[in-house]
From Swiss-Prot:
Name under which the protein is recorded: Golgi to ER traffic protein 4 homolog
Record organism: Taeniopygia guttata (Zebra finch)
Example of a GO cellular component annotation carried by this entry: cytosol
Protein family per UniProt: Belongs to the GET4 family.
A biological process term (GO) from this entry: ubiquitin-dependent protein catabolic process
């Protein structure tokens, strides 16, 4: 098999354009036949050999396509380790090439992620590198489209907390709301239906994503079976969030201040709410930052990781301001 593969690979190295692609297809055919016979180890090693040969020849696209098809093939035969290894090589081909971030490439990466064992360490390493590459070297937290695709996969796996994190770094407020409705209905207490969306809205606003904050609130309150039609709402916290979104659009500090004072009983339900609101006051109402946080320890660390450090508050709204931020 190795001799046949190498002969096909040498043919692929000749010429250009369609002829090159024809050679790659012949290589794929030989490798597929080997995998179908169950020669997994030999096929895996040959994929790796061809990858490094293509890369050394500057054939980054061919290397990427071959590794992607190989990874899918190994996944289809439940060869998780080999598939994960080739998935990492797909990323390596992207990292070492001048390939631009494009939707089809993001979809390919999300597809590989969806096929990996959810509990494997390789998946954690893969998503970290994929997000870093998708940021285009900007130092941001990854492309919002990739975050959206990852969020959808994690939602299907009922990994709601991780799905929520990625939705918050996407621009898909509607998808986030639909996931939160399911999350709240299946895992939450009826008394906390308002808290699921309140946290999401406040964190979207801390990320300067007003549009998604508004969409997630409207969609969630319309679709959640335990929330009566509003506004106004039965739950005071939902009324606060509704007024807050209106106040953010208006930008009047006095309105924001009175609003926070009037709804303190509701805001005390979660000690992080006032910390988020301190940040929102800085971003949208010109409130100067506090010299020291009122919280230390775990809460202080959580808030600092949410807000990032040293970020520029004057950047554009939404994903244009995705400075290093972690959300629990």
């Amino acid at each position: 098999m190795a001799a046949a593969i190498m002969a096909a690979e040498q043919e692929a190295a000749k010429g250009g354009g369609g002829r090159n692609r024809g050679g790659v297809q012949r290589v794929e055919g030989k490798l597929r036949a080997s995998v179908e016979k169950g020669d997994y180890y030999e096929a895996h090693q040959m994929y790796r050999t061809l990858f490094f040969r293509y890369m050394s020849q500057g054939k980054h696209a061919e290397a990427r396509e071959l590794m992607y098809s190989g990874a899918l093939l190994f996944f289809s035969h439940n060869q998780q380790n080999s598939a994960a290894d080739l998935s990492m090589l797909v990323l390596e081909s992207l990292e070492k090439s001048d390939a631009k971030v494009a939707e089809d490439l993001l979809e390919n990466l999300a597809k590989l992620f969806s096929l990996m064992d959810p509990n494997s360490p390789e998946r954690v390493a893969f998503v970290s590198r994929a997000l870093k590459w998708s940021s285009g070297g900007s130092g941001k937290l990854g492309h919002p489209k990739l975050h959206q695709l990852l969020a959808i996969t994690l939602w299907k796996e009922q990994n709601y907390s991780e799905s929520r994190y990625h939705f918050l770094h996407s621009t898909d407020g509607e998808g986030c709301a639909n996931m939160l409705v399911e999350y709240s209905s299946s895992r939450g207490y009826r008394s906390e239906v308002d808290m699921f969306v309140a946290q999401a809205v406040l964190q979207f606003l801390c990320l300067k994503n007003k549009t998604s904050a508004s969409v997630v609130f409207t969609t969630y309150t319309q679709k959640h079976p335990s929330i009566e039609k509003g506004p106004p709402f039965v739950q005071p916290l939902l009324n606060f969030i509704w007024f807050l979104l209106l106040a953010v659009d208006g930008g009047k500090l006095t309105v924001f201040t009175v609003l926070c004072e009037q709804y303190q009983p509701s805001l005390k339900r979660d000690p992080m709410y006032n910390e988020y609101l301190d940040r929102i006051g800085q971003l949208f109402f010109g409130v100067p930052p506090k010299q020291t946080s009122s919280y230390g320890g775990l809460l202080g660390n959580l808030l600092n990781s949410l807000m990032g450090t040293g970020e520029d508050d004057d950047t554009e709204e939404g994903q244009e301001d995705s400075s290093p931020i972690e959300l629990d």
